[in-house]
Swiss-Prot record:
GO cellular component, one term: cytosolic large ribosomal subunit
Family: Belongs to the bacterial ribosomal protein bL19 family.
Gene designation per UniProt: rplS
GO function term, MF aspect, one: structural constituent of ribosome
Protein name: Large ribosomal subunit protein bL19
PROSITE patterns reported for this sequence: RIBOSOMAL_L19
Function: This protein is located at the 30S-50S ribosomal subunit interface and may play a role in the structure and function of the aminoacyl-tRNA binding site.
One Pfam family matching this protein: Ribosomal_L19
Keywords linked to the UniProt accession: Ribonucleoprotein, Ribosomal protein
Record organism: Lactobacillus delbrueckii subsp. bulgaricus (strain ATCC 11842 / DSM 20081 / BCRC 10696 / JCM 1002 / NBRC 13953 / NCIMB 11778 / NCTC 12712 / WDCM 00102 / Lb 14)
Lineage: Bacteria, Bacillati, Bacillota, Bacilli, Lactobacillales
PANTHER family: LARGE RIBOSOMAL SUBUNIT PROTEIN BL19M, RIBOSOMAL PROTEIN L19
InterPro entries to which the protein is assigned, alphabetical: Ribosomal_bL19, Ribosomal_bL19_CS, Ribosomal_bL19_sf, Translation_prot_SH3-like_sf
Intrachain disulfide bonds: none
Highest rank taxon of the organism: Bacteria
GO biological process terms held by the UniProt record: translation
Length: 115
C-alpha cells in the first residue's frame, strides 16, 4: 500500500476501543443528533460478528427489544460511537454467530468465558 495512504489511515484509527470478540456482551454508547440537540443512546447486546481490519473494520451487535431481534452494525473507527464497554466475555466456538438469529430464550444463551 502507498505510504501516504497508510499514514492518512493511521491518523483516522481509534486507539480507545477495548478488546472484544464474537460472543461478548457489549454496551455501545452512540451519539444521536436530533435537530440541534445531541444525546447518548446506549445499545447493549451480543457481538455476533467482527469484520475487517484497519479503517473499514465493523462489528455487529444483536439484542432483543420488545421480543424482536435488533441488529446494528457499527464501524470500529466512527466518531458517532462515544465509547464501548465490555460487560461480559462469552465462550463460543465460532467467529460468526448467525445461528443466534434462529434461537430464542434460553437456547440463545452464551456461557461466560473463564479468565
Amino acid at each position: 500500500m502507498d505510504p501516504l495512504i497508510q499514514e492518512l489511515t493511521k491518523e483516522q484509527l481509534r486507539d480507545d476501543m477495548p478488546e472484544f470478540r464474537a460472543g461478548d456482551t457489549v454496551r455501545v454508547h452512540v451519539r444521536v443528533v436530533e435537530g440541534t440537540h445531541e444525546r447518548i443512546q446506549i445499545f447493549e447486546g451480543v457481538v455476533i460478528k467482527k469484520r475487517g481490519t484497519g479503517i473499514g473494520a465493523t462489528y455487529t451487535v444483536r439484542k432483543i427489544a420488545s421480543g424482536v431481534g435488533v441488529e446494528r452494525t457499527f464501524p470500529v473507527n466512527t466518531p458517532r460511537v462515544a465509547k464501548v464497554e465490555v460487560i461480559r466475555h462469552g465462550r463460543v466456538r465460532r467467529a460468526k454467530l448467525y445461528y443466534l438469529r434462529t434461537r430464542s430464550g434460553k437456547a440463545a444463551r452464551i456461557t461466560e468465558r473463564r479468565r
